[in-house]
Amino acid sequence: MIMAKAAAQKASAPTIDTALLAKLTGGLTDRKTIAKIGADIGHLYSEFLPDTFHSETGIAIDVEYIGSESGLMTDLIANVGQNVAVADCSLRNWCPNFMMAVGNGFVIALMERMLGASPDSIGDPDERNLSHIELDLAAMVLGRIAGVLRSGVNAPGGFEATIDPPFNANGKSAFDEMIAGLYGVTIRMKIDIGKVSSEFSLIVPQRPLLKTSIVAPKASAQALKKQEEWMDMISQQVKRSQVTLEARIKLETLTLRTISRLVAGDVIPFQDLKQDDIGVEVSANGSKLYNCEFGKSGDRYMVRVKNNVSTDDEILRHLMG
């Protein structure tokens, strides 16, 4: 009887509100403080990320602070949207479980720029998940975003941020259990590359943020070295990526009068039809790469490479623009 009464009293005991408990223990703050922290980090990114990105890639971007939002970490992560790549991140002596997200549109547009497309030719990409190579590029982008954050929060020890491999929004975070019940902040930034406008987000538990003083980073003396490292990593990705090739075969010279009278079914011979092989020029991104010969193997037409027009390094530079 006594045990039953004690159990009933325990069941009826009031439970403390989770938000109130978080406030009392330093895990949740007011809107004004959140707005100040968000604006400070937003200013850090808008001031330093474009210069850092340009010095390491040679590509210009614009970054602008959008706003911040407070809430449970699980809710904030669910609200980043579907057209993003997400990564679990940590920074020793600062925060073991924050997350970053970058819009897929920015990554796709950046990949096109790396492969030689001009800024004016790149429009808003279709909404889709990123491929494996695009996720690799997203990791590099998030690494630069994390680098600016690291320099601003000034965590003791000067450690670099750890970024797990990014995943598409339908993936699963390794932090799900760790962040359950934690309150956090989403800091949203607009990021433009050419005509493509996208976003990236920083989702951080409030507890480490409330202990952080944002400071402007010092100019890096390693910019050139980082640029070389960046280009080397992109080069490796390009070597493993698929690039659309174009083959051009010269046709027999015709008069303007003849060309104007061509109709469906007319045949135009190759210019080199009388030679042993038919010459083909293979190019990518408007740059001539190989001299080839045209032929047939079984039921398939194909070209055979005869010689390089450029060196391997020149070919790679053509493909990267």
From Swiss-Prot:
Entries under InterPro entries matching the protein: CheC-like_sf, FliN-like_C, SpoA-like_sf
Name of one Pfam family that matches: FliMN_C
Subcellular location: Cell inner membrane; Bacterial flagellum basal body
SUPFAM superfamilies named among the record's database cross-references: Surface presentation of antigens (SPOA)
Topology term for the membrane: Peripheral membrane protein
UniProt GO cellular component terms: bacterial-type flagellum basal body; plasma membrane
Coiled-coil region: none
Keywords: Bacterial flagellum, Cell inner membrane, Cell membrane, Chemotaxis, Flagellar rotation, Membrane
Protein task: FliM is one of three proteins (FliG, FliN, FliM) that forms the rotor-mounted switch complex (C ring), located at the base of the basal body. This complex interacts with the CheY and CheZ chemotaxis proteins, in addition to contacting components of the motor that determine the direction of flagellar rotation.
Annotated PANTHER family: FLAGELLAR MOTOR SWITCH PROTEIN FLIM, YOP PROTEINS TRANSLOCATION PROTEIN Q
Record protein name field: Flagellar motor switch protein FliM
